[in-house]
Amino acid sequence: MKSEAKDGEEESLQTAFKKLRVDASGSVASLSVGEGTGVRAPVRTATDDTKPKTTCASKDSWHGSTRKSSRGAVRTQRRRRSKSPVLHPPKFIHCSTIASSSSSQLKHKSQTDSPDGSSGLGISSPKEFSAGESSTSLDANHTGAVVEPLRTSVPRLPSESKKEDSSDATQVPQASLKASDLSDFQSVSKLNQGKPCTCIGKECQCKRWHDMEVYSFSGLQSVPPLAPERRSTLEDYSQSLHARTLSGSPRSCSEQARVFVDDVTIEDLSGYMEYYLYIPKKMSHMAEMMYT
């Protein structure tokens, strides 16, 4: 109520001053025309009408403590003058829509088993994350339909996975893990759980390592195919390594898993790291001076 009264007082003051100005300008114009005394009287009366309003000033200007009126306080933000772009931190999308292979289904079996679907409630689907649209625009039935199939591919916290790994290891039958599921290390290690390596003191019999590519990433795009001479050297190297392990002293299985890595692969890996890691460049001297 007080603020409304103050606003009313300020508005009345402003209108009074406007009237004064208008009347004064009118009187000057009319004086120049030549009707001097006839116009001065109405001007005098107009000023007399507005005088009591000006003497009863607003409470803000009492005791000489003038407060600024809050008229210009709400101002739209000015455009940025500097032409340098606004740098936002990179947006990582942790849920992958493609990761619905059987290995991931095995990992998240316990989540799908939960009857009330509590795990899928608070998590909107990765498509919504990447598009940046809120799930409130969708109706309730639709969100239920979206979240239900995607619950299998939702990543878990490491603490949860530690608890469930022990139960999973007993449940996983070896037939369910095919060659396509050997891409992640966890499923490979689940295959060989409970069996110690039998290669100690004999030839290495771990056949699985021989036809496994060590550096195969699903995220690599535009990998140039190896030139034929490069491929032949790679084969020679792997054959010589195999012969060495068979003939010489017994080597460990991990030695067999080491594959000849050439420059192309390493370059691809470095690009891969740059793509997924945000490594800020060193500041220039002028920027450092600005920030200190």
From Swiss-Prot:
Ranges of biased composition (kind: Basic residues): 65-83
Annotated Gene Ontology cellular component terms: nucleus
Biological process (GO), any one: cellular response to hydrogen peroxide
Presence of keyword Amino-acid biosynthesis: no
Modified residues (Phosphothreonine): T143, T233
Stretches the record annotates as Disordered: 24-178
Domain of life of the native organism: Eukaryota
InterPro entries: DUF776 (IPR008494)
Keywords annotated in UniProt: Phosphoprotein
Protein name, entry field: Oxidative stress-responsive serine-rich protein 1
Gene, per the UniProt record: OSER1
